[in-house]
C-alpha cells in the first residue's frame, strides 16, 4: 500500500486533537474537581466559527478577521473551556470577593465570557490548555491558543463553558498562526 501524506493529513490532525483533548482532561485540577469542557470541531462547523468571527469584527476588533483567516487555514479546532462558578472553597480572594460565599452571591454576566470566575478554575483552564498544546508540539502539529475563536464558538452555542479558548490545529508546510499582520 502507498499513502501520500496529503491523503491522511486531516485524519492525522484529528488523531492529534483527540490525544490533546485527553491530555487536557487528565491535567491536574484544583481539589481534583473537573470543570473543564472540551469539544472537537472540524469541517462545516469551523466555517461557522470563521463567519461568526468576521461578523464580530464589525464591532471594531479587526483582528477577528485575521484570526478567522487562521481558522480557514486549519484542519481542526479544539475548544477548551471551564465553568468558573464552582469555587474551591479556600477564600483566597483572588476573584475580588471577601469569601467564596460572597463570590457565590455575585451576579454572573458577560457578553463574551461569563464572570466573575473562581481564579483556581481559570488556573485549571490554563493548565489544561498547556497540557493540550504540549502534546501538539510533541506530535509536530502546529497550534496557537486563540481567545477570539473561543468567544465565537461560545456565542454559537458549541460549548457549555464560562470561559473558552480555541486551539486551531494545522499540518501545513508552514504554521499559519505566526507572521500574522494585524488587520486595519
From Swiss-Prot:
<keyword id="KW-0479">Metal-binding</keyword>
<feature type="binding site">
    <location>
        <position position="92"/>
    </location>
    <ligand>
        <name>[4Fe-4S] cluster</name>
    </ligand>
</feature>
<keyword id="KW-0411">Iron-sulfur</keyword>
<dbReference type="InterPro" id="IPR019224">
    <property type="entry name" value="DUF2148"/>
</dbReference>
<feature type="binding site">
    <location>
        <position position="100"/>
    </location>
    <ligand>
        <name>[4Fe-4S] cluster</name>
    </ligand>
</feature>
<dbReference type="GO" id="GO:0051539">
    <property type="term" value="F:4 iron, 4 sulfur cluster binding"/>
</dbReference>
<dbReference type="GO" id="GO:0016491">
    <property type="term" value="F:oxidoreductase activity"/>
</dbReference>
<dbReference type="GO" id="GO:0046872">
    <property type="term" value="F:metal ion binding"/>
</dbReference>
<dbReference type="Pfam" id="PF09918">
    <property type="entry name" value="DUF2148"/>
</dbReference>
<keyword id="KW-0408">Iron</keyword>
<dbReference type="InterPro" id="IPR007202">
    <property type="entry name" value="4Fe-4S_dom"/>
</dbReference>
<keyword id="KW-0004">4Fe-4S</keyword>
<feature type="binding site">
    <location>
        <position position="118"/>
    </location>
    <ligand>
        <name>[4Fe-4S] cluster</name>
    </ligand>
</feature>
<dbReference type="InterPro" id="IPR000415">
    <property type="entry name" value="Nitroreductase-like"/>
</dbReference>
<protein>
    <recommendedName>
        <fullName>Uncharacterized protein AF_2201</fullName>
    </recommendedName>
</protein>
<feature type="binding site">
    <location>
        <position position="95"/>
    </location>
    <ligand>
        <name>[4Fe-4S] cluster</name>
    </ligand>
</feature>
<feature type="domain" description="4Fe-4S">
    <location>
        <begin position="72"/>
        <end position="135"/>
    </location>
</feature>
Amino acid at each position: 500500500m502507498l499513502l501520500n501524506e496529503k491523503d491522511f493529513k486531516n485524519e492525522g490532525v484529528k488523531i492529534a486533537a483527540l490525544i490533546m483533548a485527553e491530555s487536557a482532561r487528565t491535567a491536574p485540577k484544583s481539589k481534583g474537581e473537573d470543570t473543564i469542557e472540551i469539544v472537537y470541531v472540524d469541517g462545516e462547523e469551523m466555517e461557522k466559527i470563521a463567519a461568526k468571527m468576521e461578523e464580530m469584527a464589525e464591532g471594531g476588533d479587526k483582528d477577528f478577521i485575521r484570526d478567522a483567516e487562521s481558522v480557514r487555514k486549519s484542519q481542526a479546532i479544539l475548544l477548551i473551556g471551564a465553568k468558573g462558578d464552582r469555587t474551591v472553597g479556600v477564600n483566597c480572594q483572588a476573584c475580588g470577593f471577601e469569601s467564596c460565599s460572597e463570590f457565590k452571591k455575585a451576579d454572573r454576566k458577560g457578553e463574551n465570557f461569563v464572570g466573575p470566575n473562581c481564579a483556581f478554575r481559570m488556573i485549571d483552564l490554563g493548565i489544561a490548555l498547556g497540557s493540550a498544546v504540549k502534546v501538539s508540539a510533541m506530535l509536530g502539529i502546529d497550534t496557537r491558543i486563540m481567545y477570539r475563536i473561543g468567544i465565537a464558538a461560545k456565542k454559537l452555542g458549541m460549548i457549555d463553558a464560562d470561559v473558552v479558548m480555541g486551539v486551531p490545529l494545522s499540518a501545513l508546510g508552514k504554521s499559519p498562526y505566526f507572521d500574522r499582520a494585524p488587520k486595519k
